Amino acid sequence: MVKLRLKRCGRKQRAIYRIVAIDVRSRREGRDLRKVGFYDPIKNQTYSNVPAILYFLEKGAQPTGTVHDISKKAEVFKELRINQTK
């Protein structure tokens, strides 16, 4: 099963997270299938590759709680509903 979750990057006390599609059996820093965005909690910046996120969601990937909240703010789920109604 594939999950969309955060992968920690950056240095000590300056964490930056990548949003990645990764197998659930892999550890947090394990090999990812694809990088689909990033989240910087210090500067409060996010970048999401919306087509890539939609691709993995349509294939059955489950986002973690934090990634779900980030995606909701980016209105990814509205685009998912629009694609499903077509």
Swiss-Prot record:
Its main location: plastid. PROSITE patterns: RIBOSOMAL_S16. GO terms for biological process: mitochondrial translation. Keywords: Chloroplast, Plastid, Ribonucleoprotein, Ribosomal protein. It comes from the Eukaryota. Gene3D superfamilies: 3.30.1320.10. One of its GO terms (cellular component) is small ribosomal subunit. GO terms for molecular function: structural constituent of ribosome. It is found in: Plastid, Chloroplast. InterPro entries: Ribosomal_bS16, Ribosomal_bS16_CS, Ribosomal_bS16_dom_sf. The keyword Zinc-finger does not apply. Signal peptide: none annotated. Belongs to the bacterial ribosomal protein bS16 family. PANTHER family: 30S RIBOSOMAL PROTEIN S16 (PTHR12919), SMALL RIBOSOMAL SUBUNIT PROTEIN BS16M (PTHR12919:SF20). NCBIfam families: S16. This is Small ribosomal subunit protein bS16c. It comes from Liriodendron tulipifera. The lineage of its organism: Eukaryota, Viridiplantae, Streptophyta, Embryophyta, Tracheophyta. The gene is rps16.
